[in-house]
């Protein structure tokens, strides 16, 4: 029986085929600034598909100012923004800040807490779900005040943020042993083994995709019982898996390979590019991969438009017609269209660059009309809200 996502995407693919003659140009030509100032970033990939792109989001396109900054330490992932809170996974803690003021509101984990936080969270309907150890499992936390709601014990330590199914009833989390299913009420219900620890996870509809440290890419359907569809061996540890509207997936692996995989033909490669996406990517009309530089690839055809050497180090986020990322001492915004030029020779790509106190390594997020990022140095780290 075809999955819900396959039925939806099949209709979308037929529509796309009918428009093929109209879509051969650069998709960036059709990108426009977002018009919604109230968007959120409720999970590490921004959306269930982990495409790291909010086309409707308002975000600064000109030199920003600081809404606020907050001192923190050892950030491990990009900020999560939802329901008036900014959440940050820092070493063994989950820290919460007020979205408007940056005031610290609550914390889970740390030396004086029983929980050892191991993953970034996902926020679903006012609750943050996060992977913890000692004991291993998923912890549900009230987003408003940090109250612990429940803990669901798992057979092994979590390695990825949870994802949620389309009914918002069931969570899937990656672990060192594979995948585990937990209801949003805290009832564990299944476990699936993989050959190595899960390093990347995404979902849409009733399908779940998992990448592992050993380079395996798995496709599953039905989060109620998680049935396998196919498995592919890739060339390196999987960094990111993003699901496309047309039914395929884009994957990046350690070492920088970015490729598109056919979801209807057991994961066969449609296109592949080497040494481009070791930091991750934004999957929009184009795929914008961040390695040391920024590369634009036509997501449908695989054509590489341009690559710019920008010394970037942060997993990117996209909003409207702009890509946001960072590096040593800066957060920056770049035009999706690549500015003016031909091939790799381009100008006016950078919309703005904001100096920060440290290196931006863990990724940026776009929400509530602002860009959120952390900068780390030898003395600690700072969480920035730029608008």
Residue spans of the language-model regions?
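Extracytoplasmic/lumenal domain signature
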Residues: 3, 29-118, 122-387
């Amino acid at each position: 029986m075809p999955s819900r996502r396959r039925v939806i995407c099949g209709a979308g693919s037929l529509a796309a085929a009918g428009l093929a003659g109209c879509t051969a140009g650069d998709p960036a030509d059709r990108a426009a600034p977002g018009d919604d100032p109230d968007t959120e970033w409720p999970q590490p990939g921004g959306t269930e598909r982990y495409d790291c792109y909010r086309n409707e989001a308002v975000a600064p396109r000109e030199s920003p100012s600081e809404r606020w900054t907050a001192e923190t330490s050892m950030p491990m992932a990009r900020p999560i923004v939802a329901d008036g809170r900014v959440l940050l996974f820092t070493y063994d803690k989950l820290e919460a800040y007020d979205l408007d003021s940056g005031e610290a509101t609550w914390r889970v984990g740390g030396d004086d807490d029983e929980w050892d936080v191991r993953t970034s969270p996902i926020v679903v309907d006012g609750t943050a779900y996060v992977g913890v150890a000692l004991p291993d499992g998923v912890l549900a936390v009230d987003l408003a005040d940090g109250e612990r709601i429940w803990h669901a014990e798992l057979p092994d330590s979590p390695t990825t943020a949870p994802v949620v199914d389309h009914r918002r009833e069931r969570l899937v989390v990656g672990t060192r042993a594979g995948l585990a299913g937990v209801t949003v009420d805290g009832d564990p219900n299944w476990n699936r083994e993989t050959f190595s620890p899960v390093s990347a996870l995404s979902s849409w509809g009733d399908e779940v995709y998992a990448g592992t440290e050993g380079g395996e890419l798995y496709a599953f359907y039905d989060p109620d019982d998680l049935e396998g569809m196919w498995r592919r061996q890739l060339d390196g540890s999987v960094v990111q898996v993003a699901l496309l509207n047309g039914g395929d997936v884009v994957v990046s692996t350690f070492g920088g390979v970015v490729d598109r995989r056919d979801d209807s033909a057991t994961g066969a490669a449609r296109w592949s590019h080497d040494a481009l996406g070791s930091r991750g990517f934004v999957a929009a009309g184009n795929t914008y991969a961040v390695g040391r530089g920024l590369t634009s690839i036509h997501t449908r055809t695989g054509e590489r438009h341009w690559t710019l050497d920008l010394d970037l180090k942060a997993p990117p986020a996209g909003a409207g017609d702009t890509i946001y990322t960072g590096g040593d001492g800066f957060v920056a915004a770049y035009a999706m269209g690549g500015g003016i030029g031909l091939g790799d020779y381009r100008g006016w790509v950078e919309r703005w660059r904001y100096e920060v106190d440290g290196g931006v390594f863990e990724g940026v997020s776009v929400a509530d009309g602002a860009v959120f990022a952390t900068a780390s140095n030898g003395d600690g780290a700072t969480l920035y809200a730029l608008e």
